[in-house]
From Swiss-Prot:
<dbReference type="GO" id="GO:0042803">
    <property type="term" value="F:protein homodimerization activity"/>
</dbReference>
<comment type="similarity">
    <text>Belongs to the Orn/Lys/Arg decarboxylase class-II family.</text>
</comment>
<keyword id="KW-0620">Polyamine biosynthesis</keyword>
<feature type="binding site">
    <location>
        <begin position="274"/>
        <end position="277"/>
    </location>
    <ligand>
        <name>pyridoxal 5'-phosphate</name>
    </ligand>
</feature>
<dbReference type="GO" id="GO:0006595">
    <property type="term" value="P:polyamine metabolic process"/>
</dbReference>
<dbReference type="InterPro" id="IPR022643">
    <property type="entry name" value="De-COase2_C"/>
</dbReference>
<comment type="subunit">
    <text>Homodimer. Only the dimer is catalytically active, as the active sites are constructed of residues from both monomers.</text>
</comment>
<feature type="modified residue" description="N6-(pyridoxal phosphate)lysine">
    <location>
        <position position="69"/>
    </location>
</feature>
<dbReference type="GO" id="GO:0048471">
    <property type="term" value="C:perinuclear region of cytoplasm"/>
</dbReference>
<dbReference type="InterPro" id="IPR000183">
    <property type="entry name" value="Orn/DAP/Arg_de-COase"/>
</dbReference>
<comment type="function">
    <text>Catalyzes the first and rate-limiting step of polyamine biosynthesis that converts ornithine into putrescine, which is the precursor for the polyamines, spermidine and spermine. Polyamines are essential for cell proliferation and are implicated in cellular processes, ranging from DNA replication to apoptosis.</text>
</comment>
<keyword id="KW-0663">Pyridoxal phosphate</keyword>
<feature type="binding site">
    <location>
        <position position="200"/>
    </location>
    <ligand>
        <name>pyridoxal 5'-phosphate</name>
    </ligand>
</feature>
<keyword id="KW-0597">Phosphoprotein</keyword>
<dbReference type="InterPro" id="IPR009006">
    <property type="entry name" value="Ala_racemase/Decarboxylase_C"/>
</dbReference>
<dbReference type="GO" id="GO:0033387">
    <property type="term" value="P:putrescine biosynthetic process from arginine, via ornithine"/>
</dbReference>
<feature type="binding site" description="in other chain">
    <location>
        <begin position="331"/>
        <end position="332"/>
    </location>
    <ligand>
        <name>substrate</name>
    </ligand>
</feature>
Amino acid sequence: MGSFTKEEFDCHILDEGFTAKDILDQKINEVSSSDDKDAFYVADLGDVLKKHLRWLKALPRVTPFYAVKCNDSRAIVSTLAAIGTGFDCASKTEIQLVQGLGVPPERIIYANPCKQVSQIKYAASNGVQMMTFDSEIELMKVARAHPKAKLVLRIATDDSKAVCRLSVKFGATLKTSRLLLERAKELNIDVIGVSFHVGSGCTDPETFVQAVSDARCVFDMGTEVGFSMYLLDIGGGFPGSEDTKLKFEEITSVINPALDKYFPSDSGVRIIAEPGRYYVASAFTLAVNIIAKKTVWKEQTGSDDEDESNEQTLMYYVNDGVYGSFNCILYDHAHVKALLQKRPKPDEKYYSSSIWGPTCDGLDRIVERCSLPEMHVGDWMLFENMGAYTVAAASTFNGFQRPNIYYVMSRSMWQLMKQIQSHGFPPEVEEQDVGTLPMSCAQESGMDRHPAACASASINV
């Protein structure tokens, strides 16, 4: 396992009843009298560990290989390395990141079917053998650059019901798969298994069933050609937050019977997956500050109703946008919802509003239309479930810097992390079994404890 110490990055250890949202409020309070109200994240590493415990319970036969592309923050990768996950890397840089944390090459799959030759050679020189392919050209490249590679054939799936489709770009058909297996045999390249990806944000769990069935067909083809395949990679597509129509356990309740049917536990086949957003989406909350505001009045409609004819629309400009953290709107089809850092008054009027990023691009719009009470420059908005495909793809367009990330973890989760590193996972440990132990959050975190921040009632967004 990789090492994990809170000294590697600034991770605040939290007291019982002191949550990530309390730290978020505390950070806001710290800059309340300053003009430097930069956007920032609070990321709960304990949430990542809880997701892992949930995974072990829901998919006991499937070893997760975290998709580094989803969120390559060093703290995230360190946490997952420490608890023993594998890693799905798509480039030399991602392999360097993971191996730099002490992860052995056998816990890495180079899961990019279309690789640059120099990066194939890098994988070879650093002991990374598992890698995917879906074409004859890729086979020939690997045969020359990494003849000892252990190849995994990526097959296409029906991803028509996924939010982000992948099978248009990647994956071999069943017909092509046989030809590729025969060609691999001719080239004396070892094919050890099959992989697929049903698309990011899968909305139909039955897609997994068909994909597992297709994988079984390809395994049988491999046997006929002369390969002894022993690895099935079921890819990603698992939800990472609770605001999705399809819940994680709804998917796993369909996957497990399919695996038992087509790849029973005594078949000798190792099963892995490539979850990304599942592990990190809900761990990150983004706080943005309103830097500008504009009021737009609707045109007169001729109505006698003054409220209708003069209703105002409010435009808010905040200090992060689609060129930064909210690139997920453009590239990941995300629909984000602004929450209020301060609780509105019960009788407060709400207005039609829109939220815009800070750049000079007219496309930099975060929310086209929402209903919010009137807010002011200097007020804060919060966006939950912002850990997936946000920080990893953020740019500094127009000179706007990426938000800082403040990492937190409860004392009990920290203790569990250390126990896992020393002795492995405790028997029968489950997500709901993890409580919290009292200690001084100020002592552990090095921050002043604000009474208001430690009151759970103050967190209403």
